[in-house]
Amino acid sequence: MNSRRKFVGALLAGAVAVGAAWATPALSADQVIRVGTLKLIHGITPFFYERFTPAGYKFEIVTFDTPTDGKNAVVTRSVDFGTYGLAAATLGGAAGEPVVIIGAQCNRGMAVVAGAKSAINSIKDLAGKKVAILPGSTQEVVILDRLKMEGMSIKDIQPIRVSFSDMPAALERGDIDAYVGAEPGPSISVAKGVGKIVEFPYSTPTGSVNMVMTTHQAMLKDNPDLVKTFLAMHRKATEYAMGNRGAFIDMAMQKLGQPRPTIEIAAPNVELTWNTDADWVTRAKYYGSQMLEMKQIRQLPDYSSFINTSFVAEVARLK
C-alpha cells in the first residue's frame, strides 16, 4: 500500500513538473506584433519601434514592394498593423475591405523626376513623354491632379507602369523620360547625376499627405488596448527619428542598402508623422474624391469607419 502511494505521488509530481515546464515559456513569452511596411525611406519608422517597446512585446517587421501588397497583408491579417500609401488604403476601403486608417506614417517623400540633360523642367513639359507611374499608388492620383491643374490629362503623356524600385534604373537606361517616384528613388537618380527634380508635387489640395498606418477592423473591437499601445510606440519612434537625423539616416542606409549621399539628399523630402488631425482628414477625403472623379473607385469609403481618429487622439494627449 505504501509503495502504491509513493508511485501515485511520484506520478503526480511528474505531471506537475511537466505542466510547469510547459507553462513557464507560455507565461514569459512576449506578444509578437507583426507590422508591414514598404521598402522606402518614408516607411522606415517601424525599424525604430524596438527602442520603445514595453516589456511583454516584441516586433516582427515585414517589408513589401508595393502598397497593394501591404494593404492585402492587413486585410488577410498576415500583419497586425501595416503602413503604405493613402491610395491603396482608399482602394480597399472603397471596395468594402476591412481596413481602417488609425494614424499617419509620413508626409512628402515623392517627386517628379526627369533625365538630367532633358528639356523637361515643368509638368507641362511632360506632354508626349514616357512617364513611369505606379498604378494604385498615392503618386498616381497626385500626378493626375497636377496634370489637371495644368490643363492636361493622362492622355497628354505616355504612362508606363513601373515599380518604384525600378524607376531610377529605367530612367538611366532611357526606357522612360520621367517618373513620378517615391524616395529614395528620386535621390538615387539625382545622386548618380542621371536625373533632376522637376517638382515636389505638393501644391494640390492633397498637400503632402502620403503614407498611412492601418489595421484590420476586427483589431479595434478585439484588442483596442493593443492599438493604443502600438500607436504610443509609433508616436515615440516617429518623434525620435525626426529629432535624430543621424539615427534616421543610419537606419535608412542599413535597411535600404543605399549610400549616405543618396539618403542625405532624400531625408529633407521626408516628414515622418503619426497624427491624423482635422486638416489631415480633410486632405485625405479630398484625395478620395479625386480617386472617385478619376474613376479609380466606384464609391467613396465610409469615412465614419474608414478613418478612425479616436485612438490617435488619445495618444496625442499623452506626454
Residue map of PLM features:
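N-terminal signal peptide c-region/cleavage motif recognized by signal peptidases
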Residues: 23-24
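Conserved C-terminal helix/tail region of periplasmic/extracytoplasmic solute-binding proteins
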Residues: 292-319
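N-terminal secretory signal peptides and thylakoid transit peptides that target proteins
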Residues: 1-14
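Short, glycine-/small- and polar/acidic-enriched structural segments
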Residues: 27-153, 158-164, 177-183, 194-200, ...
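Secondary-structure end/capping motifs
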Residues: 222-298
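Residue-level signal for alpha-helical transmembrane segments in multi-pass membrane proteins
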Residues: 15-19
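Phosphate-coordinating loops and pocket residues in cytosolic domains that bind phosphorylated ligands
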Residues: 9, 128, 191, 308
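Pocket-lining segment of extracytoplasmic ligand-binding domains
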Residues: 87-88, 160, 165-254
